[in-house]
From Swiss-Prot:
Main localization (coarse): secreted
UniProt-recorded Gene Ontology molecular function terms: neuropeptide hormone activity
Entry GO terms, CC: extracellular region
Keyword Cytoplasm carried by entry: no
Protein name from the UniProt record: Pyrokinin-5
Modified residues (Leucine amide): L18
Purpose of the protein: Myoactive.
InterPro entries: Pyrokinin_CS (IPR001484)
Length: 18
């Protein structure tokens, strides 16, 4: 997801969990 996430396999964003 654009907001970030811990291991979003479907997205291209791998940021911190906000």
């Amino acid at each position: 997801s654009a907001s970030g996430g811990a291991g979003e396999s479907s997205g291209m964003w791998f940021g911190p969990r906000l």
